[in-house]
Amino acid sequence: MQSIRGAITIEKNEVKYIKEASIKLFSEILSRNNLNIEDIVSIFISCTNDIDKGYPGKYIRENFNLKNIAIMHFNEMYVEGSMPLCIRILILIDKKIKI
């Protein structure tokens, strides 16, 4: 099992931006790593505490039709001066990839 991660920031704490960024980041992770949905074991998503208008995993699940993949959401630990409005995704895969 391997893990792949990525991060993206959004312009505003609004559903539109959360949805667009989540789908974009997930799609980019799949594309850059030549992954198929079948390779995914589970997905972990964290957001900074200034994102509270929507669940990124909901939009990813709907857009990519992920019915049997576990998705968990977490709040990112707050650190003074850290990057605001940030969504991070960690995907666990059952495939060997060259990193």
Question: Model regions: which residues?
Answer:
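Terminal domain-initiation and capping elements
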Residues: M1-I99
